[in-house]
Amino acid sequence: MQENLVIVESPAKAKTIEKFLGKDFIVKSSFGHIRDLAKKDLGINIGEGYKPVYEIPGDKKKVVDELTKLAKSKTVWLASDEDREGEAIAWHLTEVLGLPVDRTKRIVFHEITKRAILEAIEKPRTVNMDLVNAQQARRILDRLVGFELSPVLWKKVRPALSAGRVQSVAVRLIVEREREIIAFRSAAYFRVVAQFYAAGDPEKTLFKAELSSRFETEAQAETFLQSCIGATFTVAKAEEKPAQRYPAPPFTTSTLQQEAGRKLGMSVSQTMSVAQHLYEQGLITYMRTDSVNLSQQALAQCKEEITKLYGEKYSRWFNYKTKTKGAQEAHEAIRPSYIERQEIEGTPAEKKLYDLIWKRTVASQMVCAELDRTTITIDMSGSSNQFVAQGEVVRFDGFLRLYSESTDDDQAAESGEGLLPKLTAGDRVLPSQITATERFTSAPARYNEASLVKRLEELGIGRPSTYAPTITTIINRGYVVKQNRDGQKRNYAQLTLTGEKIASKTLSENYGKEKNRLSPTDIGMVVNDYLEEQFGPIIDYNFTASVEKEFDRIAEGDITWDKMIDEFYGPFHKMVDSAITTQTAKTREVRILGNDPKTGHIVKARIGRYGPMVEIEGNEGEKGRFASLKKGQLIESITLEEALELFALPRDLGQLDGEELMVGIGKYGPYVRYGKSFASLAKTDDPYTIGYDRAVEIVRAHQAAAAAANTPLKSFPEDADMLVKNGRYGPYIAYKGKNYRLSKGAKPEELTLDDCLKIVAGSKK
């Protein structure tokens, strides 16, 4: 029997740790939580001080049995992660395995390295019940909210809906942003940019300067350009200032999620999954943290690595302070376990994320970039308007040699020019060209996953462990969709003054293109509106942030968890009772869009049985015509013209082999129908625009697949009824009008008649 049993959450983590410990240690995984609130009913005894009712899920009983046997070892070490969730796992293990909570050894570490593991073994502690209670309070509160809110939504909105405390706030943010976009009205203006060169410069080296004023109309812009003809342009002032650009601090959970989204295109959940693998392999420190601190050892390793790669002048120690609201346990920032290790083996995603973490960590300890920023202000005779030229030159790259932080803006911000000419006040400059270009104000950008995490963190809502599951949940519930939008084409005017002539032309551009942006669905908007109306305080941003602070106070031992729950539950339960009894409409609002020009009948948008739709009312006593909204369309913003386009389906594309070829949308999505057969369209095919040739291609592929399915993979002359076929879900046996599934891994081409008869006989038992 081993002297010591170490219990961790995951098999990968167990495998890594076992390499560092001797033969006296056995390391086993609990595979996450070994028990949870009972799934049947509420799982909380409200009348007994909110006492939770825990149960061991069926899929964990085998794990628990094994750990119970092994727990008879001399010493049990609980090595789950060092956060509230990990502390709760450790406590549940003591409860289920019958271990004394006040004597069982609890070890924690930020990184899975031999040094860290052995240090933890040297300094064990016991389970921190304050951290356990904070996690338990969150779990109980979220169960209470979900359990009591969901039936209200079933009754008042639509069956099978659900709501959550933090998730509902995230949906609210996305809904509010969508309504800002719907309400936004773009305004045109004209931006004036000149290309100047210094008088007396034989090379006529050009530099760009922008007019400090903007014009609302093309006529105003043209009038200004007319005034530039023959005008004198003189430098009013030229300022040159040294500047520094500081490196970004090492990654926290949220900044890693944001930067991985911007630089690598990873979703929040993908980032956390890859980071988890890196951590369990001992390659990075713990990935759920809101700290930007680095250990003294890590700082020393960074200095050594920077000096080796770039020289000592690039190294500087930075001590960063955590600014996040309610930052939790004193973890380190996310960093490589071994700073000297620049590259790793692994999947492409693991390599990319590790490289990002390595660069950010090392760059955080490099010197600032040294810049020269120049601003030249140019006066124009006969006008109060001024042109301004800005230039920026990097004199010493510092940390920029290794890493530069991205921004949330999809379009790179226009930076100033590089080196500007040496000019002083009173110097004359001459215009080579002055251009007035029509621009347009932009609507607020929809959130992507990274910017939503950033906003939640700014509001103090959620914690490092909750961001990814929150986003996953609201998408899975159908309240939010992540989608791309093709840009739209628009024309814009441009006036150019060259010499004494003004040329005018119309150009075109695409705008509004989006990738992986979060939009609310119609049902998401309906649920949000209902929750705001009936449960406004619960999804209030400040209130949700204050609940997080209460969890923090529990973790610090300042308040008891049951008191905190009681103060929340009383007012909340009254809201639930009020919402159930009030005669609130089911919020199935109908939006009248106008009248159908062909029939004069009313066209309206609403949520139907199968989702958002539009309807053209029929004559009295007759049914109307219905059409589903396209992905990305909303009841709240769809126009009459867009709604009428939806009734273009089904479309008649002509004849194929003497049969009608039709395109439409059915219960299971877009399809092509030829005769009595149906073939699904690919995701890239638009039923409103698909042409005849593409439809025929889909039909022929469908026919070929059907023919292949009807052709037996194997037949037997001695029994004509026995056939081995290839079906939609794989190979199967067809025998005397019935079908029989093959076992996983069976090779249909190797089956004999006896094999097939045994399968048939076995299925009948």
What is each PLM-predicted segment?
Residues 22, 29, 38, 151, ...:
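Accessory interaction regions appended to the cores of large information-processing enzymes
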